[in-house]
């Protein structure tokens, strides 16, 4: 049996990041979004490399429809970006993250 009162738990940080307007410059034209090479926002690749070095779990979030998954994956790969998970088809608009407070005071966000 594990004694959890003496066990040290390392919490891996999770990054949730939107695509359009955050990774790539915003493109309102859906047909261009699906076919054109997207323009990266400055310093995006460097930030992703920093997150990888820190072993963060990266979740891409987007309102892009599921039908654009393959082209979106290719755009991200062609830009030299990597991620652990991608959530597509979210509603347009603000996204709010609500995270818990750990009883021992561990900072989680």
Where are these regions (language model features)?
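HAD-like aspartate-dependent phosphatase fold
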Residues: 1-109
